[in-house]
């Protein structure tokens, strides 16, 4: 899910 666009490597994959 794209919750945090600031950290797409971690939050982007979740």
Curated annotation (Swiss-Prot):
It is found in: Secreted. GO terms for cellular component: extracellular region. Its main location: secreted. Coiled coil: none annotated. It comes from the Eukaryota. Keywords: Amidation, Neuropeptide, Secreted. Midgut. One of its GO terms (biological process) is neuropeptide signaling pathway. The modification Arginine amide is found at residue 14. Myoactive peptide. Increases the amplitude and frequency of spontaneous contractions and tonus of hindgut muscle. This is Tachykinin-1. It comes from Schistocerca gregaria.
